[in-house]
Amino acid sequence: MLIREYSDSDLNALRKMHASQDFDYSFPDLSDPLFVSKLILEDDAGRTVLASLARLTCEMYLLVDPTAGNPRERFGRLQMLHLAGERDLIARGLEDAHAWLPPRIAKRFGRRLESFGWVRDDGWTPYCRRLRD
């Protein structure tokens, strides 16, 4: 077995693997620079049988001074910062942003996010692998 970097000659094999899995997502654009790691595993016969594809995404953090202004003012400030942040992320080439809400604020703050166009995504079960302590 051999693990190596992806090359364009792997594309058809990866498309076939993707189709055979029958998952509900489009085949990704592997030329997108947000794919920062593309590893292929070949079997002993030299066939591409596995691929690990890592695309950068964005995890959002929001820090708020709860004593600064009244709720209406804080919401207005959040709207302004949200729009500026969205433009900034797009300018940097990002395609999506994710927010993991603490359970105690998820329902209420989730409604605020939805008012800005965010969608709750429970369709897939997220897992996390910490790479550093």
Mark where each language-model region is.
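A short beta-loop-alpha structural element at the N-terminal edge
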Residues: 1-14
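Short secondary-structure junctions
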Residues: 3-5, 25, 117-123
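Helix-loop element at the rim of GNAT/NAT acetyltransferase active sites that forms part
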Residues: 5, 16-28
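Proline- and acidic/polar-enriched loop/turn elements at helix boundaries
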Residues: 30, 101, 125-126
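Conserved donor-binding loop and adjoining core beta-sheet/short helix segment
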Residues: 31-73, 131-133
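Acyl-donor binding region in acyl/amide transferases
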Residues: 58-116, 121-122
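C-terminal "cap" of GNAT-fold acetyltransferases
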Residues: 122-133
